[in-house]
Design a protein with these regions (language model features):
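Residues that define the transmembrane beta-barrel architecture of outer-membrane proteins
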Residues: 30-34, 51-57, 98-104, 117, ...
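Positively charged n-region of N-terminal signal peptides that target proteins for export
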Residues: 1-4, 20
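Short glycine/proline- and aromatic-enriched beta-strand/turn motifs that initiate or cap beta-hairpins
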Residues: 19-71, 196-198, 202-208
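Extracellular loop and loop/strand-boundary signature of outer-membrane beta-barrel proteins
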Residues: 44-48, 89-96, 145-152, 185-189
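Gram-negative (and chloroplast) outer-membrane scaffold detector with strong preference
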Residues: 60-141, 170-172, 205-208
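Hydrophobic h-region of N-terminal signal peptides that target proteins for export
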Residues: 10-18
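Predominantly the C-terminal beta-signal and adjacent terminal strand-loop region
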Residues: 81, 85, 160-208
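Transmembrane beta-barrel strands of outer-membrane/channel proteins
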Residues: 34-42, 74-80, 121-127, 166, ...
């Protein structure tokens, strides 16, 4: 995991250094977006058997071609998944353990038009590391839930994140926006499939 973070940091540093030139070799101008993205979401499908909501904060760096209206960037952060609770008659309420995630995503965004108001559609492709409690995944495990302390798994999964968003430039340096996304992580080995519906707020610092 430390190796992945180091590689990501080197890529981000290279992008920042490259941004000082402001134009590609073919002359097309571009901007660099540095973004802070707090978000919240609702667990869906099998993910909702063990968790209720998901909250997190991400950092993103995006290289945006002004004429092509295409943005390519990297995003990483931390997610906290609120655990589900179970209550049986004559027994106290018991909570699952919370799940924790670290996503690393390569984003592709297309801006419908590149003005002060910038609506866009996009797709994120990447991996996510997480630690999960699957104690409530099946009826059998639910019946035995009070007899165990923790039924956990951890590891990496591959995921896709389709999204739509809106960015509003307040001036040539600062912007704010909203992003609606449907992240989907594929199951792998004993890690279950996960998807949710998320809404995020974006603050963007523009390096033009």
């Amino acid at each position: 995991m430390k190796k992945h973070i180091l590689i990501l940091a080197l890529i981000l540093t290279s992008l920042c250094a490259f941004s000082q030139r402001h134009r590609l070799p073919n002359g097309e101008p571009y901007d660099i977006f540095m973004q802070i993205k707090p978000m919240g979401g609702i667990a869906l499908g099998d993910f909702a058997k063990n968790n209720t909501y998901i909250y997190g904060s991400h950092f993103a760096l995006e290289f945006q071609l002004q004429e092509t209206k295409l943005g390519i960037g990297l995003e990483f952060g931390y997610n906290y998944c609120v655990p589900m609770a179970i209550k049986r008659p004559f027994l106290q309420t018991k909570n699952n353990w919370a799940s924790h995630q670290i996503p690393m995503i390569l984003n592709f965004n297309y801006y419908i038009f590149n003005e002060r108001i910038k609506p866009y559609v996009g797709l994120g492709i990447g991996t996510i590391w997480g630690r999960y409690d699957y104690s409530l995944s099946t009826e059998e495990s639910t019946e035995e839930y009070y007899l165990r302390d923790f039924e956990g798994q951890s590891g990496w999964r591959f995921g896709l994140t389709p999204k739509v968003g809106l960015m509003i430039s307040m001036d040539h340096r600062h912007g704010f926006g909203l992003e609606f996304s449907l992240p989907y992580q594929f199951g792998f080995n004993r890690l279950e499939t996960q998807y949710s519906i998320n809404l995020g707020l974006n603050y963007t610092y523009i390096i033009d």
